[in-house]
Regions:
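Generic hydrophobic alpha-helical segments
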Residues: 43, 185-186, 203, 321, ...
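Loop-rich catalytic cores of soluble enzymes, especially ATP-dependent carboxylate-amine ligases
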Residues: 103, 125-126, 130-132, 136-307
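Long, well-ordered mid-to-C-terminal structural blocks that present hydrophobic/aromatic surfaces
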Residues: 272-356
């Protein structure tokens, strides 16, 4: 037996992490993460991890050419690189993620992204590979996608595939665009978390980029949303108490504590922990250091639409081309970092219920951009939120919203644009247009 932690002590292990990230408004930044599929340029066949011609070889070549990047190895395999807060990491199916060091300036973030892409394409071009930003691999069957050689991924795969019939698809076939935003206080945490939870059906729907999976056209919309809804319900979606009057940082901590961490990564060999909760397993830790390690893991192995760490991670958008992705980042900055906009959003979504959010997700799944949610159509939500966001941005950053405005005014989403291009010229040419290569206009 380890130390007997009180409920309050367990909560504090988590709330200390969240509160440790609080910053003054004048220092708030935005941090984008873009996940890509590595594909063969000619065939658009997916490139997997193993070997010198795989994603592993791409990272190894990158490290040889850029020795100032710090490598991360797992069980002898290179799985990540980091430099000055920018990183290149891999998702379980070798989706390649670029995380950009946060900045107040979206223009600086675009330049950072372009610099990483330029360095990657020095390697990819001779190999005949490209990076493609789309929410779900349109072709490759699940069984043809090996996981990275990490024992923890095997444990996650085994556990979550028992909880949801699309868990294996989540790990192997999906790709996202995520944005991290700063928080200033407990009150700011609660207001941002609630607003973002309420906005989640809107962002899932308007950034849907998936017309096909495993070679079959999809009748329903919002494929990534539905994959997450059928992965492991206790660790996905939104915490059930988010719209309760007394929701707090402690409430979020309680939700994390009630979730099984799947395995224990601290203090030696990784071992599976089944359905035991983080709260239960904390009682077996001997030291504060071991408990903090376990809590850090527990906060990372939940996958809600909005995940709290030292920042809030917004996880409800498909991977999409940069013009739309950075439009989304600008949109979120303009909405969340402007006090007038936050007050208006809180008024719009008060009162609110988890069930209403779920119904909104159902409407997006069934009807796409022409679906209806919380008193309006998704397209009107999108255009209205863009207008609000412009009020919270400089004229220069407001221009990043223009591609989204054009998209939604035409009743389009990334999915409908891609489907139309596929119908005209086939998948190979259509996906080449979605290659992540030149992102500076």
């Amino acid at each position: 037996m380890g130390k007997r932690w009180t409920v309050e002590e367990k909560r504090r292990l988590i709330t200390n992490v969240i509160r440790g990230g609080y910053t003054d408004r004048i220092r708030w930044q935005v941090g984008p993460e873009i996940e890509h599929f590595v594909m063969e340029r000619k065939s658009m066949k997916r490139v997997m991890y193993p070997g010198e011609k795989g994603v592993e070889g791409i990272l190894e070549t990158f490290l040889r050419r850029h020795a100032d990047w710090t490598p991360t190895y797992d069980e002898g395999h290179l799985i990540g690189l980091e430099k000055l807060g920018n990183s290149i990491t891999l998702e379980p199916g070798a989706q390649l993620e670029t995380s950009l060091a946060p900045s107040e300036s979206l223009r600086i973030l675009l330049h950072r992204y372009q610099e990483i892409l330029d360095a990657l394409y020095e390697i990819l071009d001779p190999m005949g590979y490209v990076l493609v930003t789309v929410g779900v691999d349109p072709f490759t069957p699940i069984d043809a996608i090996p996981l990275l050689p990490k024992h923890r991924y095997e444990l996650m795969d085994a556990h979550m595939s028992q909880k949801g019939n699309l868990a294996r698809a989540m790990m192997r076939q999906s790709a996202a665009f995520q944005v991290s935003v700063d928080v200033g206080s407990d009150a700011d945490f609660v207001s941002k978390y609630r607003v973002l939870a309420a906005l989640s059906p809107i962002f899932y729907t308007l950034f849907d980029s998936v017309p096909q999976r495993e070679g079959k056209a999809l009748e329903k919309f919002n494929a990534r949303q539905e994959i997450w809804r059928h992965t492991d319900p206790v660790r996905t979606g939104i915490p059930p108490t988010v719209f309760d009057p007394d929701f707090s940082v402690e409430s979020y901590a309680d939700w994390v504590l009630s979730t099984p961490p799947i395995f224990v990564p601290c203090g030696g060999a990784i071992k599976a922990t089944g359905d035991r909760t983080l709260s239960d397993i904390l009682n077996e830790t001997e030291t504060e250091e071991e408990a903090q390690c376990l809590v850090k893991h527990g906060m990372s192995i939940v996958f809600p639409d909005i995940r709290a760490k030292q920042i809030l991670e917004i996880r409800v958008m498909d991977s999409v081309p940069a013009s739309w992705a950075f439009g989304a980042a600008a949109m979120l900055k303009g909405l969340l970092y402007n006090m007038n906009n936050m007050r208006r959003l809180q008024d719009m979504f008060t009162p609110m219920q988890v069930d209403w959010v779920e119904r909104g997700k159902n409407s997006g799944r069934d009807n796409g951009i022409q679906g209806y949610y919380h008193s309006d159509y998704f397209v009107n939500w999108g255009l209205g939120l863009l207008a609000m966001a412009r009020e919270g941005l400089s004229v220069q950053e407001g221009k990043l919203l223009d591609p989204l405005e054009i998209l939604w005014k035409n009743l389009d989403t990334p999915r409908s644009v891609l489907a139309r291009n596929v119908a005209k010229e086939g998948w190979t040419k259509a996906l080449r247009k979605w290659e992540a290569r030149h992102v500076l206009s």
